[in-house]
């Protein structure tokens, strides 16, 4: 009888341990940088497309992290986390630019490696899978000009 009780308790303990109890994004469809128990909203913008050259205003993002492999949380409503890509941006003329090689312009920007994991319900954890240099970056759905900008410093 004790053996049956133990066998039933082990799976239940595993379910209880899997419950996420960390910080939760206050708004859906915005990527938040994770700094311990603090969530920092990324700078959410719409990138201007000029024939494969994308740009956003400003030389640096208001969202900053010292982490070379940043972690993000996003509560998905409309944004599909599996479609997010990570890009490095160049600063030119007081704005951030990204040349993708689509359209008239040729560029070499390729998405950097990410891991996307479902945490709980519609909550996803997104992690850079490689160390990032101290420059400007964004997460962006691969079918949209929406960008979640941040800076690694």
Which residues fall in each region the model found?
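A glycine-anchored, Pro-Gly-centered beta-turn/N-cap motif
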Residues: 122, 128-138
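ATP-dependent kinase catalytic cores of phosphoinositide-metabolizing enzymes
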Residues: 125-126, 144
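Alpha-helix C-terminal capping segments
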Residues: 10, 138-140
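Hydrophobic h-region of N-terminal signal peptides that target proteins for export
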Residues: 8-17
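Primarily secretory-pathway and cell-envelope proteins
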Residues: 17-102, 141-153
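Solvent-exposed loop and beta-edge segments used for protein-protein assembly and interaction
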Residues: 66-68, 118-120, 131
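Extended, solvent-exposed segments with strong compositional bias
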Residues: 98-121
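Sec-dependent signal peptide recognition
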Residues: 1-7
């Amino acid at each position: 009888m004790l053996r049956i009780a133990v066998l039933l308790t082990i799976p239940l303990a595993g379910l209880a341990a899997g419950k996420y109890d960390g910080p939760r994004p206050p708004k859906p469809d915005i990527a938040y940088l994770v700094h311990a128990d603090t969530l920092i909203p990324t700078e959410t913008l719409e990138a201007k497309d000029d024939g494969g050259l994308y740009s956003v205003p400003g030389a640096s993002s208001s969202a900053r992290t010292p982490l070379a492999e940043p972690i993000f949380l996003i509560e998905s409503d409309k944004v599909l986390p599996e479609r997010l890509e990570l890009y490095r941006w160049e600063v030119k003329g007081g704005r951030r630019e990204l040349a993708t090689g689509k359209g008239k312009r040729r560029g070499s920007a390729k998405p950097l490696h990410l891991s996307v994991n479902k945490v709980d319900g519609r909550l996803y954890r997104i992690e850079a899978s490689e160390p990032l240099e101290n420059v400007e970056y964004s997460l962006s759905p691969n079918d949209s000009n929406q960008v979640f900008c941040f800076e690694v410093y």
